[in-house]
UniProtKB/Swiss-Prot annotation:
Annotated PROSITE patterns: AA_TRNA_LIGASE_I
InterPro entries, per the entry: aa-tRNA-synth_I_cd-bd (IPR045462), aa-tRNA-synth_I_codon-bd_sub2 (IPR020751), aa-tRNA-synth_I_CS (IPR001412), aa_tRNA-synth_I_cd-bd_sf (IPR008925), Glu-tRNA-ligase_bac/mito (IPR004527), Glu-tRNA-synth_I_codon-bd_sub1 (IPR020752), Glu/Gln-tRNA-synth (IPR000924), Glu/Gln-tRNA-synth_Ib_cat-dom (IPR020058)
Protein name: Glutamate--tRNA ligase
Binding site for ATP: 251
EC class: ligase
Length: 476
């Protein structure tokens, strides 16, 4: 049996990290078992589904490196097949029209709650006579279609993550609605639990891998598999991603969409690396930093945890910084040029850009950090308090004047770093000023602060752009 798994997102929002982690686990499982990873866009919510969200989801998966093996299925294009299945269930006596109004159902639920019972449909219209149906139709009532769930049934499966799971059908809320309300002679839009079963069967899905919040749905869907005569897939219910308080991660916790992580400057490799660790434990000796290829060669559900996985920003940022630090200077430069362009900064030469990237790379956690780390090399900085104080100490400006005079006499000719060191040494010897004072004063004048990257390399970069003398002179 060839493994076939799927991701079935609803295009009602951008690709959420929870959905992306589900996609990742599906993809890894397919890769490990030489199977197929498929996409089904569940766009049956007509009001909220938008093409822009479908594009966002697919682009996000591509950015993460999670390529699908067949053309995506659009669920709404199968509505005819869905309605035909409902007709078949009605004809077999496994589904029926329920004419209960929303007001009647709410009154029923209120009474159950007041009696200390869990709200559930009481199956009141399961055995309507023809006369009763005709009266409801004459009264102009619309109807939903409900699937019969017998109270004495037991649902069970061996979950790939959680082991044996048993569910009493009496705890599933009564007969299940499988189509929206519509005029009595019509069938309304088919609903989630039914269409998922129909589509998974049509796509020959062998393993359904999704979040633990779908466990109750799985119990209902297994009853539908049985009624429809379909072979049941295997199920794996993965742990939810939690916030720092142990609640399900949501938009209220800040950034949760993959496109936002990308915009902030996270790398796709760091994202897939970190998401794999959200609920999965790597084998001993593998460590926490690995590629998609490495994790796909060892991924299995025996190492997926039951408990929720807390989102750890610090670990994600560490993985991201490690990934950036391992990039070649060329790759990082290619990522930074568009960001610099947005700031209005023009790169004079690739060689200069590569030297700048090499200088700032160790300081980067996010790709976007390259904007602020680079700013001082593109824009004349304001002097910070520590720089102003440094320039006010005795002999600081005397040293800078000496450096300025020497700069006018000394051609750099591509030897910026060597000449910078020679000038500092010459100044120290000629004026009998400690090198520490000279270097701090130069840093204050050139970079506007006493903090920052290596002074000699920074000075060399500014000299290549002929910006060093002007910055020193403004401080005299």
């Amino acid at each position: 049996m060839k493994v076939r798994v799927r991701l079935a997102p609803s295009p009602t929002g951008s690709l959420h990290i929870g959905t992306a982690r589900t996609a990742l686990f599906n993809w890894l499982f397919a890769q490990r078992n030489k199977g197929s990873f498929l996409i089904r866009i569940e766009d049956t919510d007509k009001e909220r589904s938008k093409d822009e969200f479908t594009s966002n989801i697919l682009e996000g998966l591509q950015w993460l490196g999670l390529k699908w093996d067949e053309a995506p299925i659009i669920q709404s294009k199968r509505i005819h097949e869905h309605k035909e299945a409902i007709k078949s269930l009605i004809n077999k006596g496994l589904a029926y029209r329920c004419f209960a109004t929303e007001e009647e159902l709410q009154t029923m639920r209120d009474a159950q709650i007041n009696s200390g019972e869990a709200p559930r449909y009481d199956n009141r219209h399961r055995k309507l006579t023809k006369e009763q149906e005709q009266k409801f139709i004459k009264d102009g009532r619309s109807a939903v279609i409900r699937f019969r769930i017998e109270d004495e049934e037991s649902v069970h499966w061996n979950d790939m993550v959680r082991g044996p799971i048993h569910w009493n059908s009496k705890d599933l809320g009564g007969d299940m609605v499988i189509s929206r309300r519509a005029p009595a002679n019509e069938i309304g839009d088919p609903l989630y639990n039914l269409v998922v079963v129909l589509d998974d069967a049509a796509m020959e899905i062998t393993h359904v891998i999704r979040g633990e919040d779908h466990i109750a749905n799985t119990a209902k869907q297994l009853l539908l598999y049985k009624a429809l005569g379909f072979k049941e897939p295997s199920f794996a219910h993965t742990p939810l991603i939690l916030n720092k308080d142990g609640r399900k991660l949501s938009k209220r916790d800040g950034v949760t969409s993959i496109s936002d992580f990308k915009t902030m400057g996270y790398t796709s490799q760091a994202m897939t690396n970190y998401m794999t660790l959200l609920g999965w434990s790597p084998p001993e000796g593998m460590g926490e930093k690995f590629t998609l290829k490495e994790s796909s060669s060892v991924f299995d559900f025996d190492r997926v945890n039951n408990a929720g996985a807390k989102f750890d920003w610090d670990k994600l940022q560490w993985l991201n910084s490690q990934e950036i630090h391992n990039w070649s200077n060329e790759k990082l430069l290619d990522s930074l040029i568009p960001l610099w362009t947005k700031e209005g900064w023009n790169l004079s030469s690739k060689d200069w850009g590569l030297k700048l990237v090499h200088l700032i790379k160790p300081s980067l956690i996010l790709i976007n950090d390259g904007i602020e780390e680079s700013r001082v090399f593109f824009e004349e900085p304001l002097l910070k308090k520590d720089a102003i104080q440094q320039l006010e100490i005795p002999r600081a400006k005397e040293a800078l004047k000496f450096i300025c005079r020497k700069l006018e006499e000394t051609p750099w000719h591509g030897k910026e770093n060597e000449i910078a060191i020679e000038l500092i040494t010459s100044c120290s010897k000629s004026l009998d000023i400690k090198k520490g004072i000279i270097m701090k004063s130069l840093r204050a004048a050139l970079l506007g602060t006493l903090q920052g990257p290596d002074l000699i390399t920074s000075w060399g970069l500014l000299a290549m752009m002929e910006n060093d003398q002007a910055r020193i002179k403004r401080c005299l």
